[in-house]
């Protein structure tokens, strides 16, 4: 059986721009993408802390070290410059791989939109795994 688990999270990044007439997607600083283990065109979920909007799109690389986070296409209507968002990506993980599965958590400095801290954590501890396998 497969379980859907959080794979990557970019926590509290500020929107730095919007381009309504771009094809679509979210443009994200390439350094932040790499830290979060996100690849170009990967599906992401976006949660806008300021207005409560939640939507799906895909991520494309922006200029490295720029701190950019740009909503493109229809998504540009769902957030404004300066809004704080959370970006999440999920993965289907086989139960036999749960013990080695790692989540990438990237925390953003709210003043500069650069990486404040990155953590790789085990998604599940042994007690949870024991309950899952019973």
UniProtKB/Swiss-Prot annotation:
Reactions accelerated catalytically: L-aspartate + H(+) = beta-alanine + CO2
Main location: cytoplasm
Domain of life: Bacteria
Cellular compartments per GO CC: cytosol
Keywords assigned by UniProt, alphabetized: Autocatalytic cleavage, Cytoplasm, Decarboxylase, Lyase, Pantothenate biosynthesis, Pyruvate, Schiff base, Zymogen
UniProt cross-references to Pfam families, sorted A to Z: Asp_decarbox (PF02261)
Pathway: Cofactor biosynthesis; (R)-pantothenate biosynthesis; beta-alanine from L-aspartate: step 1/1
PTM note: Is synthesized initially as an inactive proenzyme, which is activated by self-cleavage at a specific serine bond to produce a beta-subunit with a hydroxyl group at its C-terminus and an alpha-subunit with a pyruvoyl group at its N-terminus.
Keyword Nucleotide-binding on entry: no
GO annotation (BP), single: alanine biosynthetic process
Cofactor: pyruvate
EC number: 4.1.1.11
Active site: 25 (schiff-base intermediate with substrate), 58 (proton donor)
InterPro entries: Asp_de-COase-like_dom_sf, Asp_decarbox
Function description: Catalyzes the pyruvoyl-dependent decarboxylation of aspartate to produce beta-alanine.
Subunit structure: Heterooctamer of four alpha and four beta subunits.
HAMAP family xref list: PanD (MF_00446)
Protein name (record): Aspartate 1-decarboxylase
Protein's organism: Sulfurihydrogenibium sp. (strain YO3AOP1)
Gene that encodes it: panD
């Amino acid at each position: 059986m497969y379980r859907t688990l959080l794979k990557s999270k970019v926590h509290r990044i500020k929107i730095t721009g919007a381009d309504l007439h771009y094809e679509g997607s979210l443009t994200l600083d390439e350094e932040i993408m790499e830290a979060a283990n996100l690849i170009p065109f990967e599906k992401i979920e976006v949660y806008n802390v300021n207005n409560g909007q939640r939507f799906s799109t895909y991520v494309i690389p922006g200029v490295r070290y720029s701190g950019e986070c740009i909503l493109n296409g229809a998504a540009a209507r769902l957030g404004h410059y300066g809004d704080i968002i959370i970006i999440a990506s999920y993965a289907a993980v086989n139960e036999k791989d749960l013990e080695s599965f790692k989540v990438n958590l990237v925390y953003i400095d709210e003043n500069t939109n650069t990486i404040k801290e990155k953590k790789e954590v085990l998604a599940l501890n042994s007690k949870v795994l024991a309950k899952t396998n019973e």
